[in-house]
């Protein structure tokens, strides 16, 4: 004798109601053979729905044994029970329980998704089942576009998606007109004839009369069992295509979860947008601040480079503001010669500032009069635009010649060619021999008038001084500025016998600017992070609301074979999608801000980096995971019986 399909031994179900324990099903024994068509009847409150939930593994008995093909279901964990529901049971509900945002074909495919069937196979099976049930022309219609009878046939097709070895039909005709009810019962009888085990749960004796065996329940006890009728050898029902595990299965699950998430987001567009708003603001703020900081940094570094790249300035005294600096006269020609002989330096030039006014004919202007060496313009990276620069002969001869910039020409000479013109620098007449580009680097104004003379001429013919106010050196390419600076300090300290000077390099300015920029970026980013956290809380709140609104959908998915991990994954992916979309919109807003900024502000350009954009997406994804986990976990832990009963 073959083993029974289903055996219930002393099954009992009790619920806690306040402080009292209510027994819904008293100990009962029941055996169901494969291929039977059974009707479980009884009045409301008789326990028939509870028995159906136990048979379909949606609920667990309080005591007793439930054996399916000899396997005690009490020994199965949640994952094994989900597989049992997925591969062996098919549910048909009184209210159809179709997902309203999916069409008929997609509703039928749901169990096959959780079974791991490939997309092509489940689509083909879905279409075949709908055609078999007379709905081939309705496969792309949503439930709202179908009649009650058509919806119930879609429900039957869904129950058969994975083979439907056991079909549990809860009041299958309860919401249908008489004609549709007859059609549904005819389909169930046909399925029974094909070898499916059919279990009807109904209070309608007319519906029950279609079954070969009727079990009557009253007050949680079996009042009557008509007994099994002899039947032909059951035919094995057609099984669903074999499911798969691994990457392909996981990809199908992810894709299905993403599709469901998109449907849920589109169903509540305004709510979804408001949920994203905090994330949009936070991401836009972070990306914009970083871009602005990078733009400001690039601007300052460009200005510093305009002063002369890899340059180090040497000043007398201990530091800026040293009162004794004016009395220190140790920076001299011998120091300059010693520095010029160092292999790590490309050039060196002194600087001596001289007071005085500039006069040309009847025009007078105040400006910067500086004595420099012939290496000065190369050290500073200044380009000649007209004439020539100083040479060593001019330095040796203390020549009364000058190099000027465009601002000096504009202020004194107007539009005439400046080269060859004689201007009065203080009391010394000098001839202009060259023009260089205006100095507009870091700390310099493009409005200043600049005149450069050989330092020897300034020291002997303008002021009586045999020491330099400043030395500027340029480090060779490939040499680390910090090492060159340290070597120069050691050289001059050894020569002077004491360190009576200090250095200031473009590298130190850059580091200071980068530190300041990083601090400001961190400060504003911290404020933006608060906005992101607020946005994350908004995501969590809306996902909690979504779980409540979609409780019945969760129950349906569990009934057709979804595991807890499937439900957790679906809602977690939805939270991540909301956050990611918010991140994308935030980056878009930031790029738009950058475009507007470039139209109205010319001095600084916002520099958007791929790293900051990727970080923005990473942050938004992390927010989705962190703040979406709690709602997703709540969804996965829902009791399927309570979820299905929720209106």
Curated annotation (Swiss-Prot):
EC number(s) from the headed UniProt entry = 7.6.2.-
Annotated region (Disordered), positions in chain: 223-247
Ranges that cross the membrane? 273-293, 527-547, 581-601, 610-630
GO:BP terms for this protein?
A: response to antibiotic
> Which molecular function GO terms apply here?
ATP binding; ATP hydrolysis activity; transmembrane transporter activity
Per UniProt, ATP binds at 42-49
What UniProt keywords are attached to this protein's entry? Antibiotic resistance, ATP-binding, Cell inner membrane, Cell membrane, Membrane, Nucleotide-binding, Translocase, Transmembrane, Transmembrane helix, Transport
Enumerate the SUPFAM superfamilies for this protein: P-loop containing nucleoside triphosphate hydrolases
| Cellular compartments annotated | Cell inner membrane
| GO cellular component terms given for this protein | plasma membrane
Report the Pfam families cross-referenced here: ABC_tran (PF00005), FtsX (PF02687), MacB_PCD (PF12704)
Where is the sequence biased in composition, kind Low complexity?
230-242
Q: How does it sit in the membrane?
A: Multi-pass membrane protein
Described function: Part of the tripartite efflux system MacAB-TolC. MacB is a non-canonical ABC transporter that contains transmembrane domains (TMD), which form a pore in the inner membrane, and an ATP-binding domain (NBD), which is responsible for energy generation. Confers resistance against macrolides.
* Homology family: Belongs to the ABC transporter superfamily. Macrolide exporter (TC 3.A.1.122) family.
User: What do we know about how this protein assembles, alone or with others?
Assistant: Homodimer. Part of the tripartite efflux system MacAB-TolC, which is composed of an inner membrane transporter, MacB, a periplasmic membrane fusion protein, MacA, and an outer membrane component, TolC. The complex forms a large protein conduit and can translocate molecules across both the inner and outer membranes. Interacts with MacA.
- The protein's name is Macrolide export ATP-binding/permease protein MacB 2
> To which species is this protein native?
Aeromonas hydrophila subsp. hydrophila (strain ATCC 7966 / DSM 30187 / BCRC 13018 / CCUG 14551 / JCM 1027 / KCTC 2358 / NCIMB 9240 / NCTC 8049)
Query: What is the organism lineage in this UniProt record?
Result: Bacteria, Pseudomonadati, Pseudomonadota, Gammaproteobacteria, Aeromonadales
């Amino acid at each position: 004798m073959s083993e029974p399909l289903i055996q219930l031994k002393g099954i009992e179900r009790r619920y806690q109601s306040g402080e009292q324990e209510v027994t819904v099903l008293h100990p009962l024994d029941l055996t169901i053979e494969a291929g039977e068509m059974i009707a479980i009847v009884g009045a409301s409150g008789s326990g028939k729905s509870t028995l159906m939930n136990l048979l379909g593994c949606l609920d667990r008995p309080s005591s007793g044994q439930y054996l399916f093909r000899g396997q005690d279901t009490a020994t199965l964990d949640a994952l094994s029970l989900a597989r049992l529901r997925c591969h062996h049971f098919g549910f048909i509900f009184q209210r159809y329980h179709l997902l309203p945002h999916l069409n008929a074909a997609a509703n039928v495919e749901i169990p096959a998704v959780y079974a791991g069937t490939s997309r092509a196979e489940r689509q083909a099976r879905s279409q075949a089942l709908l055609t078999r049930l007379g709905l081939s022309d309705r496969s792309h219609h949503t439930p709202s576009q179908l009649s009650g009878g058509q919806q119930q046939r879609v429900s039957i097709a869904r129950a058969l998606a994975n083979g439907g070895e056991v079909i549990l039909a809860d009041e299958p005709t309860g919401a249908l007109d008489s004609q549709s009810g007859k059609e549904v019962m005819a389909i169930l009888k046909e399925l029974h004839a094909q070898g499916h085990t059919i279990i009807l749960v109904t209070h309608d004796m007319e519906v029950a009369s279609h079954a070969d065996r009727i079990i009557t329940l009253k007050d949680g006890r079996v009042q009557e069992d008509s007994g099994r009728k002899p039947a032909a050898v059951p035919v094995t029902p057609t099984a669903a295509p074999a499911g798969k595990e691994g990457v392909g299965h996981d990809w199908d699950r992810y894709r299905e979860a993403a599709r469901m998430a998109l449907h849920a987001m589109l169903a509540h567009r305004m709510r979804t947008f408001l949920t994203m708003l905090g994330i949009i603001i936070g991401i836009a703020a972070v990306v914009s601040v970083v871009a602005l900081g990078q733009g400001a940094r690039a601007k300052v570094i460009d200005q510093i480079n305009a002063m002369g790249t890899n340059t180090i300035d040497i000043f007398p005294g201990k530091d800026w503001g040293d009162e004794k600096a004016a009395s220190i006269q140790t920076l001299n020609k011998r120091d300059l010669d010693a520095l010029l002989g160092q292999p790590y330096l490309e050039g060196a030039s002194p600087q001596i500032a001289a007071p005085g006014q500039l006069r040309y004919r009847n025009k007078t202007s105040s400006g910067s009069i500086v004595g420099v060496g012939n290496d000065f313009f190369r050290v500073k990276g200044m380009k000649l635009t007209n004439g020539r620069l100083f040479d060593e002969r001019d330095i040796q001869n203390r020549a009364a010649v000058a190099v000027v910039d465009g601002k000096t020409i504009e202020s004194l000479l107007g539009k005439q060619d400046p080269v060859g013109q004689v201007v009065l620098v203080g009391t010394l007449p000098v001839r202009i021999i060259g023009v260089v580009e205006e100095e507009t680097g870091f700390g310099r104004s493009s409005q200043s008038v600049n005149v450069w003379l050989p330092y020897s001429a300034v020291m002997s013919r303008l002021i009586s001084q045999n020491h330099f106010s400043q030395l500027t050196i340029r480090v060779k390419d490939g040499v680390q500025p910090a090492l060159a600076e340290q070597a120069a300090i050691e050289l001059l300290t050894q020569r002077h016998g004491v360190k009576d000077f200090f250095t200031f390099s473009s590298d130190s300015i850059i580091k200071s600017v980068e530190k300041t920029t990083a601090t400001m970026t961190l400060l504003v980013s911290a404020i933006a992070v608060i906005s992101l956290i607020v946005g994350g809380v908004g995501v969590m709140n809306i996902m909690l609301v979504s779980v409540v609104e979609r409780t019945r959908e969760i129950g349906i998915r569990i009934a057709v074979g979804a595991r807890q991990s499937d439900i957790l994954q679906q809602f977690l992916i939805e939270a991540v999608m909301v956050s990611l979309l918010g991140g994308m919109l935030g980056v878009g807003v930031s790029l738009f801000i950058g475009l507007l900024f470039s139209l109205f502000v010319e001095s600084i350009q916002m520099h958007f980096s791929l790293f900051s954009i990727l970080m923005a997406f990473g942050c938004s994804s992390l927010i989705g995971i962190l703040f979406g986990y709690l709602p997703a976990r709540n969804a996965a832990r829902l009791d399927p019986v309570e979820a299905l009963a929720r209106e």
